[in-house]
Curated annotation (Swiss-Prot):
Swiss-Prot/TrEMBL keywords: Cytoplasm, FAD, Flavoprotein, NAD, NADP, Oxidoreductase
Organism: Pseudomonas entomophila (strain L48)
Compartment(s) of residence: Cytoplasm
Function: Conversion of NADPH, generated by peripheral catabolic pathways, to NADH, which can enter the respiratory chain for energy generation.
Cofactor(s) it depends on: FAD
Binding locations of FAD: 35-44
EC number(s) on file: 1.6.1.1
One GO MF term: flavin adenine dinucleotide binding
PANTHER family listed in its UniProt record: DISULFIDE OXIDOREDUCTASE (PTHR22912), SOLUBLE PYRIDINE NUCLEOTIDE TRANSHYDROGENASE (PTHR22912:SF93)
Listed name of the protein: Soluble pyridine nucleotide transhydrogenase
């Protein structure tokens, strides 16, 4: 058994692990990275964020070709299979792996492929694919092993018609009808993707409203758009059992209803990848979801061991995970890079997409904050008309008296890009966070960013 000594060992090469390893390496620390897959990138690159967003992009292109009258001069609408669309995602994954492999090499981060587990508080044993065991001894260890779909024990996920958000990427056919169980972010995104391919989608929601953490107007807009695009949403429903058939699946609900489809996609909950880490050897406990508790410095109950990303829970976003990993390493190297990551924009890649940051109307009303609303509807925006993307709106919530921006909510074309302008102004100190910035600043024309100016004028016109 070979023994290696490091300043920092990072478990997991997803966004959190990458952020941690790069920050520690650039601070001059000797760093090792351990990943159970034989390629870097983690679930984000191989099973989650990257493939699903690449799929979404391809599906949007197909939808534009099939619905834009201009393209009828080229040919009639075309049908594309899910495996065909998946090929574009596979190319993106390969490019991402190559890029990230280069990052680790340039920054002298040693990468070990294999299953890592704790022997003690400073030792990680890595069982490599060839059976060889490597021992890594480190002053500090960062757990960034991510999460995986939660699988109830009473559902047979080995059945060829039952999938979760990881295994759906191995789907070898295009179902005519698909049940998506769980209407969280992942469920809504995949419902959009399959609907765009012409699949009839039954979206089963445990709650009474889609994505209830969103501003209610944005949530309602998504529901309306789903209803117009072959997605049937069933609220306040829970599964009783899943019956696998030779040619499909039947979902039995506790309400007594039954839904039959060609396949079932389970998108209800995730659990932290902690069960194979040997945490019992170092006294770290996990919650019912397999997640690790950390403090604001991202330190666990063991002083030299840190956690970041999905494995610690909220907000379980790739963007936040990278910053959490970087901050965890910042707590170790003390280079001024630590911050508690809480100003996180939400990006939901449905079709159309959604993004928001700050408070929503429900929260401001409950807190009795005197706010006003400014809106810009994309159907009136020149850039949206040019792009053929008239659906959606930008909504700014601001304080009636100080004009401080309290929240930005966007539904539609380029929403996840547009939100960052509002985020930048919201993060300005004191009076610099002001709605008037948008009416006193010249925007390129025509752009989607111009929606901020339109929404600001709309909001100011409401004041008296």
């Amino acid at each position: 058994m070979a023994v290696y000594n490091y300043d920092v060992v990072v478990l997991g090469s997803g966004p959190a692990g990458e952020g941690a390893a790069m920050n520690a390496a650039k601070a001059g620390r000797k760093v090792a990275m351990v990943d159970s897959r034989r390629q870097v990138g983690g679930n984000c690159t191989h099973l989650g964020t990257i493939p699903s967003k690449a799929l979404r992009h391809s599906v949007r292109q197909i939808m534009q070709f099939n619905t834009n009258p201009m393209f009828r001069a080229i040919g009639e609408p075309r049908w594309f299979s899910f495996p065909d669309v998946l090929k574009s995602a596979e190319k993106v994954i390969s490019k991402q792996v190559a890029s990230r492999t280069g990052y680790y090499a340039r920054n002298r981060v040693d990468v070990f492929f294999g299953t890592g587990s704790f022997a003690d508080e400073q030792t990680v044993e890595v069982v490599c694919p060839n059976g060889v065991v490597e021992k890594l001894v480190a002053k500090h260890i960062i757990i960034a092993t991510g999460s995986r779909p939660y699988r109830p024990a009473d559902i047979d996920f080995h059945h060829p018609r039952v999938y979760d958000s990881d295994t759906i990427l191995s789907l070898s056919h295009t179902p005519r009808k698909l049940i998506v169980y769980g209407a969280g972010v992942i469920g809504c995104e995949y419902a959009s993707i399959f609907s765009g391919l012409g699949v009839l989608v039954e979206l089963v929601d445990n709650r009474g409203q889609l994505l209830s953490f969103l501003d209610s107007e944005i949530s309602q807009a998504l529901s309306y758009h789903f209803s117009n695009n072959n997605i049937t949403v069933r609220h306040n429903e829970e599964y009783e059992r899943v019956e696998g058939l030779d040619n499909g699946v039947v979902l039995h609900l506790k309400s007594g209803k039954k839904i039959k489809a060609d396949a079932l996609l389970w998108c209800n909950g995730r659990t932290g990848n902690t069960d194979r880490l040997g945490l019992e050897n170092i006294g770290i406990k996990v919650n019912s979801r397999g997640q690790i508790e950390v403090d604001q410095a991202y330190r666990t109950s063991v002083p030299n061991i840190y956690g970041a990303g999905d494995v610690i829970g909220w907000p379980s976003l790739a963007s936040a995970a990278h910053d959490q990993g970087r901050s965890a390493a910042g707590s170790i190297v003390d280079n001024g890079s630590w911050r508690f990551v809480d100003d996180v924009p939400t990006g939901i890649y449905t079709i159309p997409e959604i993004s928001s940051i700050g408070k929503n109307e429900q929260e401001l009303t409950q807190a009795k904050v005197p706010y006003e609303v400014g809106k810009a509807f994309f159907k009136s925006m020149a850039r949206a008309q040019i792009a053929g993307e008239p659906q959606g709106m930008l909504k700014i919530l601001f304080h009636r008296e100080t004009l401080e921006i309290l929240g930005v909510h966007c539904f539609g074309y380029q929403a996840s890009e547009i939100v960052h302008i509002g985020q930048a102004i919201m993060n300005q100190p004191g009076e610099q966070n002001n709605l008037k910035y948008f009416v006193n600043t010249t925007f390129n024309y025509p752009t989607m960013a111009e929606a901020y100016r339109v929404a600001a004028y709309d909001g100011l016109n409401r004041l008296f």
